[in-house]
């Protein structure tokens, strides 16, 4: 503000998004609020105050599908203007637990092989890039 010399910065809502890999499979889910109910995607969720990104990832994954993860690695980020979010992408490895969907958020969650994927987001968005990363990682391993 020029009158009081205060700087105002836009508020953004940080959110994690993660590709979870178990051996040669990726965990994908259909969300309750997905516009296309046939589409599966990676898990995502908003960071809570006082929480690190890694803590958020572990919490969101456990809340949404009931599993534990390990070996969390930063992938990349993407601005998501609606609702003023910054998506921070990660990859993670499955650690333990059985899939148990939170019905308020997840309709279905399953493990998929790279060559048997359902309908997924376009590679232009971070979710699609994470899934593409998984597919390419499996192609490299089979060479």
What are these regions (language model features)?
Residues 2-41, 46-47, 68-69, 92-94:
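N-terminal strand-loop-strand
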């Amino acid at each position: 503000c020029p009158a009081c010399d205060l700087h105002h910065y836009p508020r953004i809502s940080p959110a994690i998004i993660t590709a979870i890999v178990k051996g040669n499979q990726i965990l994908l889910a259909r969300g309750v609020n997905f516009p296309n109910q046939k589409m599966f995607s990676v898990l995502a969720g908003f960071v809570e105050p006082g929480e690190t990104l890694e803590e958020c990832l572990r919490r969101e994954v456990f809340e949404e599908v009931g599993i534990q993860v390990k070996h969390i690695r930063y992938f990349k980020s993407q601005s998501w203007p609606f609702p003023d979010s910054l998506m921070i992408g990660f990859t993670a490895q499955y650690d333990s637990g059985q899939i148990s969907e939170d019905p308020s958020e997840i309709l279905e969650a399953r493990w998929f092989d790279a060559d048997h994927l359902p309908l997924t987001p376009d590679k232009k968005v971070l979710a699609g890039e994470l899934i593409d990363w998984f597919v390419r990682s499996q192609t490299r391993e089979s060479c």
